[in-house]
Amino acid sequence: MTTTQSAMRMVEGDHIKNWQASSDSGIFGSLDMAVEDLGFLMKRNRLDSGDQTGKFPSRSESAPPSMEGSFAALRNLLKQQEGSSSEVLSRAIENYDSEEEIRSDPAYVAYYLSNINLNPRLPPPLISRENQHLLRHFGDNNQSPTTSWDNMGIRSSLHSSRTALSTHREEPEDEASSGEQQSYASLAGRRKSIADMIQEDFPLTLSSVFKRPHSAGNRPIAQDIHAISSDTSSEHARRLPESDINSVNLLRETDSLSSDAIASEDPFTTDLASQSFTNAQTERLNARQASHEDNNLSVFGASPPSSVASRMRRNQEDQQSQGRRMPPQYTPSSYQVQASSPQQMSYPRIGGTQDMMQSLPKIATGEVHSTFQSPHGLAPPPMYTSTAAYMTSLSPFYHQNFQSSGMFVPQYNYGGYPPASGIVPQYMSGYPSHEATVPMPYDISSTSSGYNNPRLLPGVSSSGQNIPSLVDPFQLQYFQQAQVDAYAPPFQSSTDSFGQKDQQAVGYMANHEPLNSPLSPGYGLQSPRHMGNYFAVPPGVRVMPQYPGSPLASPVMPSSPVGGMMSHFGRRSETRYHQQGPSRNTGIYPGGWQGNRGGASSIVDDLKRHSFLDELKSPNARKLELSDIAGRVVEFSVDQHGSRFIQQKLEHCSDEEKASVFSEVLPQASKLMTDVFGNYVIQKFIEHGTPAQREELVKQLAGQMVSLSLQMYGCRVIQKALEVIDVDQKTELIRELDGNVLKCVRDQNGNHVIQKCIESMPAGRIGFVIAAFRGQVATLSTHPYGCRVIQRILEHCSDDEETHCIIDEILESAFALAHDQYGNYVTQHVLERGKPDERRQIIEKLTGNVVQMSQHKYASNVVEKCLEHADSTEREFLIEEIMGKSEEDNHLLAMMKDQFANYVVQKVLEISKDQQREILVQRMKIHLQSLRKYTYGKHIVARFEQLFGEESEVSEEGTEG
């Protein structure tokens, strides 16, 4: 017979013991039968007796293993491993009478995990993997090697000697602890997970994850763990020898005081007394705990030691002495204060919060987690006092930290509420200020004594109402975070809250925080446009806004100044250009705040302006007029869509509307001239404005011609003015450029102004411009901007005597300019527009170097212009130089293969006539086949076939024949 998943009855006998029915018998009915069978087998087959292999029935070697064989193998294995964990298991099996007790012992768990691969049919332990991990965690505090009670002659678990963290449970007086009177067999009847024990301990947990039916009593999780690991042994204490009672008593005392012992190990931790209990209730609770310990000790047959109460008092005195040695900036607190009843909630004792506490809701699972301030700026690790408490609260063990990486753990959290919510900190006037504590979304202290009383807070009633809405945890990543040394001593920022920051802190932040951070707009003192509704903050601290940035939106601090338009995520909507200069936005606010212009009315104006701009962008918007933007013309002029709107209206509007718009534009004309969009509005006024308006704008140009000529957008306004205004006004304006002509010519913007002067004014009016070029023509001709100015002079001033000096300098440097990337354009311009004598002089300078210049990137263009604009005699000389004097000259073949000269050959084919063409065609026919193999030779072949198609075909046939 083989073992199956549910044990089967295999042997009967008179030694069967009737076990107490488990509370889970309805679900695991077949397991009770297995308990009886396994108990009989264990009593019939003691593993510590002599060799009894003959008592097991003989089986075939091919038959699967039986339960008897498994125990026999286990016995032999235990004999070979004396002193190991198997010895502990062997002694434990002697004293266990049921399978559940064996499978619940941690020693069996260790044996099961080490031998499951050898014997897959071993029944699994009743302790789930979650509870195994938790039991191991409870024993991690003891760094010494694991010891067992078996060394003293009694059986226990492998982890019984480790320090277990028990939870102190506070119960009403009329409640009786019935969990200790129940049989632990019901607990071992089924495997319980962490979630089951949490549901038993906290039946009102808000999370739906743990809403499962449970059958066990509502005992705290620490008691369940204690029942699994340690209390199971107390049921069989009567089996222990009398000599081992004292050691057991010592362990029991250590276990009962484990919570106090661990709490006292931290030199900076003390108990936080609950505000809901009186001193009398605390004394009765201590008395009940002492009697409970005495009852536990009396089970072993020993009298209750009188040292237990004294030891508890001694622990309390040690904790008080440790609290006196704490630094003054650390608030005495424990890690957790658990509310054991849905009707009671424990809060920290902080002055000035009694009235506020009356209005707070009674949270069933409410707990206060106080992040203790350690000297190194780190919070001590939380202890597993209650697993459900950490899962229902926002502990970093079970929830991600919604604060930024630079933020520490929140000071106070409530189960079921977002982290660092504004429920309590906003009214904790006695709590240390920001300089010594973690930054909170709201100020939890004040700099004046008037705010120490919650009744004096503006907008807040004495009962603590008008509590702000909670922050959405999933939106915290979009809020601005406070950046400050949260654990710095208070004296470091004892100056005015709006004073300068410590220079070392500024340097550190500048080197360790990215400047482009979307949540970090800058360092030092932040402007109110970057801060939310906050008051009396440390210098440079940025806060997490929960309300729109408006003075009317804060129910707590209605006088908090905030400028600009703040969206829900703290983004501001400000105009790119301001009307009143850099100092117009300064307002008078307490504490040195710089407010927005106009306060609330400015916000309305901004909303109206943005609504108009949105309508301009929309294709289906209503038709707007210039009168709709009255008073905002300048702001619309610097906007892309607003500038286009004004330009369109100025072309067809009435004189009255022009005058209205012009009255707003004229005071800011100088700034609009240099604006990327505003300059078009000025140009439109110069073009479509009245003569009086043009004259006013010209006066605005006077005195700043040089600066505007060198500016990207200002030079366009000047060019437009030179096109429209009369000659006298032009002459008056351009005289300001005298002495700065060459500077403007070499500038990427100013050269356009000089070109416009040459184009729009007679040569007699710009004599100072031409005079500035004397001796600089060759240099300016090789300049990227100067060559353009020289060409404009050749176009518009070639007939004047004053320009002869410029042409003479070009002819003298014709050969050099022909090889320059910019000068070749000047030479070509003279060949195209110059007089015949000027062209002849250039051709004479180039004769003898035509083949070499034809292979040059820039000079080849000049050679083409010479062939195109030369007379017949000059052209013949150039073609003869290209073709050579005899057929032995290979100039033509080399030019046809060259990447630049092939264009010169194509030009020769186009312009040659009569005898020269015949000679050229005959010489080119010889090389047509070879030219097809070259990239640039193909261009010659294609051009030749296009001009002389029939002759080329005949020549090819003759060559093949």
UniProtKB/Swiss-Prot annotation:
Domain of life: Eukaryota
Residue stretches of biased makeup (Polar residues): 331-344
One Gene Ontology term of the molecular function aspect: single-stranded RNA binding
Claim: Phosphoprotein is one of the keywords in the record: yes
Keywords assigned by UniProt, alphabetized: Cytoplasm, Phosphoprotein, Repeat, RNA-binding, Translation regulation
Residues with Phosphoserine modification: 193
UniProt-annotated location(s): Cytoplasm
InterPro entries in alphabetical order: ARM-like (IPR011989), ARM-type_fold (IPR016024), PUM-HD (IPR033133), Pumilio_RNA-bd (IPR033712), Pumilio_RNA-bd_rpt (IPR001313)
Gene Ontology CC terms, in alphabetical order: cytoplasm; cytosol; plant-type vacuole
Name assigned to this protein: Pumilio homolog 5
